[in-house]
Design a protein with these regions (language model features):
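Solvent-exposed serine/threonine-rich low-complexity stretches and specific carbohydrate-binding patches
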Residues: 110-113, 161-162, 207, 256-257, ...
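Short beta-strand elements that form the blades of beta-propeller/WD-repeat-like
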Residues: 1-9, 32-44, 75-88, 127-137, ...
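Eukaryotic tandem repeat interaction scaffolds
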Residues: 128-235, 528, 537-625
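Solvent-exposed loop/turn segments flanking beta-strands in beta-repeat/beta-sandwich domains
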Residues: 332-351
Length: 677
């Protein structure tokens, strides 16, 4: 007989020894098997129902209350007999053999027990033998005695007093075994003694991490182990079934997992458990040709013993513009497995480490990814880059039984391209020319515009040599792949294009010469409504020119067109994208008195009349567009204070009259020089 649990409800099944066929038993009330027989007893109140699974005959119910009051328990020792405990109404208990006869029920007292004994358990080893635990009221230790009952003689024939409370017990014609467990202890001792001797002559096997240990006896060997392997959070050698020789110190592992065992015919045992090779089920334990116990599967219940990968639910494409997070799940044969998933961005090699976990009663390992590079500070807010990812799952059995399992797969992250984004993760980057004249891009630590460059690894855009340029303009996508590009003008007036790759910049391509006539350059916005990034250039005479983007790397701009004159009153221009009004890119301009003005783009390369934003902007060395750092649909602005070198973010509001919020400082500001773009 085997027992299974599903959602806290037990079910029972009977497996035929001969052919391994399994029959589900009715009801969820416990069944008790009579050792070395096909008899099962199921109790409800004082009624005991016996099923003979060998003959398949109809169940026979016996109500012990018809005999006399006080019969509250009983286990079949044969088709028509029970070993029962009778509670004397005047006090004390007696062990009785109750037999069903043609004239009714007959009770016979089992002799050899002290008056007033308190019987705590009765186990039927065979139709001939029972194991009984009882407490002697005269014994001040209150430790249960262990007695072997000869059912045919109606007498106790062996009686021992263990040193501590006992749990598992077993008996054979030659030996008696039990488990001693001191109070409040996780240690236990398996004790085996020849029958007719005393515990002083016993073999004692001390064990650690024991809980609910069971024992069994087979010719010349004691077997022990405990259940719970599939629910375990840690390793324990006792989860398997171990056989220890009674004649020497040999020990062998018989099963990798173990739940319970009952005596079988011919000196064998039947055990519920599993092996890595055969999986979970019912096993016959018998001596091999070498005299060592071995397991032979009788029936499988279909469950693997080894940790097994079952399935996954992983999205193929994750659109982080539409969804702020993505759900992943993996199903394994054991929900307690220690699971780690490493997701690697193919283009950069950047690896994310996830620890999926089970939730509620689900057996799936689940993980909800927020699209960030890490679950843990300091990088919890840095979005992961777009593109192809591989994932690799490693699951290790928490119970230590069997090898780890591995599984790999892929998924893709996508977002729409945004200006000022050089690492292709959907948010703008802050480009910085460092003191060694290298160029790097810093990513925001949170999606709200706060930065901390101490904690984020900047993306290298070029090592050294950037001092040859007197103008650097961070733009949107001008040509080639949909990544932000960069313009740089050298001191001879030649303009160069660096195309972005999502993980750096390509080699420069010459746009053309003569650009020294301009003292202000700004880009990163679509001013003409064709979804291409355009460039504004103001010459030293105060004329503002539009260079419309073409999308071609060899000729990224069309011939210039005049926007207007008198722009010389401004010492700072910034094409910022959509700040307010229609979707077209807008322009902010700071005059020499420090007043900042807003020009709303019309979408044709021209602008509305200016609107005053406010004064005091002379506090900044320069002001430039930064894209939409908080991803609310409105462009944001950076102002860089000169003393000290302190950058501030102004977040766009979408309102023409108040286009920006109050400023928000960037963290770790002392790190920056004035060379920010």
């Amino acid at each position: 007989m085997t027992r299974y649990s599903a959602d806290g409800v037990f079910s029972y099944a009977w497996t035929r020894y001969a052919d391994g066929s399994t029959t589900l038993l009715p009801g969820s009330r416990p069944y008790v098997q009579t050792g070395r027989t096909d008899l099962l007893t199921q109790g409800e109140g004082t009624v005991r129902t016996v099923r003979d699974m060998g003959t398949g005959s109809e169940p026979v119910a016996t109500d012990l209350a018809h005999l006399a009051p006080g019969y509250t328990s009983g286990v079949a020792s044969g088709p028509s007999s029970f070993v029962t405990v009778w509670a004397d109404p005047e006090g004390g208990e007696e062990l009785h053999i109750v037999t069903r006869t043609a004239t009714g029920l007959r009770a016979e007292k089992v002799t050899g027990f002290p008056e007033g004994a308190d019987f705590t358990s009765v186990a039927i080893d065979s139709p001939h033998t029972a194991l009984v635990r009882y407490v002697d009221p005269a014994d001040t230790t209150a430790v249960s005695h262990l007695a072997v009952v000869d059912i045919e003689r109606r007498a106790s024939v062996d009686d021992v007093t263990p040193a501590h409370a006992t749990s598992g017990t077993a008996v054979s014609p030659t030996h008696l075994a039990w488990v001693e467990t001191p109070a409040n202890s996780t240690t236990a001792t398996v004790v085996v003694m020849p029958r007719g001797t005393t515990p002083d002559d016993a073999l004692r096997i001390p064990l650690r991490m024991a809980a609910g240990l069971r024992v069994a006896l087979i010719d010349g060997w004691v077997l022990y182990g405990q259940g719970g392997a599939h629910e375990a959070y840690r390793t324990n050698p006792l989860y398997g079934l171990t056989a220890r020789s009674l004649t020497d110190e040999r020990s062998v592992k018989v099963l990798d997992t173990f739940d319970r065992a009952v005596p079988g015919p011919g000196g064998t045992m039947l055990a519920q458990g599993g092996t890595l090779a055969g999986g979970e089920g019912v096993y016959r334990i018998l001596l091999g040709a070498d005299g060592v116990p071995a397991a032979e599967q009788v029936a499988s219940d279909g469950r693997p013993t080894a940790l097994t990968y079952l399935s996954e639910d992983v999205p193929e494409v994750i659109d982080l513009d539409q969804d702020k997070s993505a759900d992943f799940s993996w199903r394994l044969s054991n929900r307690q497995a220690l699971t780690v998933v490493k997701a690697t961005h193919v283009a950069t090699g950047r690896t994310l480490t996830w620890s999926p976990s089970t939730r509620g009663l689900s057996d799936a390992k689940r993980y909800t990814w927020n699209g960030a590079l890490s679950d843990y500070m300091p990088e919890s807010g840095v979005p992961a880059p777009n593109g192809a990812y591989t994932w690799h799952l490693t699951a290790t059995p928490a119970n230590g039984i069997g090898p780890a399992v591995e599984k790999s797969g892929t998924f893709t992250v996508k977002r729409a391209p945004v200006p000022h984004d050089y690492d292709d993760n959907g948010v703008p980057d802050l480009v910085h020319r460092e003191y060694d004249n290298s160029l790097v891009a810093h990513n925001p630590i949170t999606p709200l515009g706060a930065y901390n460059t101490s904690y984020t690894q900047p993306l290298s855009l070029g090592t050294g040599g950037w001092q040859i340029y007197d103008r650097i303009v961070a733009t949107g996508d001008l040509a080639g792949p949909p990544h932000s590009d960069l313009l740089a003008r050298d001191r001879a007036g030649v303009l160069w294009l660096y195309q972005g790759t999502g993980k750096g910049l390509t080699r420069r391509v010459q746009v053309g010469g003569g650009w020294q006539v301009y003292d202000k350059l700004t880009s990163a916005a679509d001013l003409t409504g064709d979804n291409r990034t355009d460039l504004l250039a103001a010459d030293k005479a105060g004329v503002l020119w539009l260079y419309k983007g073409t999308g071609s790397a060899s000729a990224p701009f069309a011939k210039r067109t005049k926007v207007g004159s008198s722009w010389g009153v401004y010492n700072n221009l910034a094409a910022v994208g959509n700040v307010a009004g229609a979707a077209a890119g807008d322009l902010v301009a700071r005059d020499r008195a420090g007043v900042l003005w807003l020009y709303l783009g019309k979408g044709d390369g021209t602008f509305t009349a200016r609107t005053r934003i406010g004064g005091g902007w002379q506090a900044y060395d320069h002001v430039f567009g930064f894209g939409d750092v908080d991803r609310d649909g409105y462009a944001d602005l950076i102002g860089l204070a000169e003393a000290p070198n302190k950058p501030y973010v102004y977040r766009g509001t979408g309102l023409r009259t108040t286009p920006f919020t109050a400023r928000q400082p960037l963290y770790n500001d002392a790190y920056f020089s004035l060379d920010l773009y």
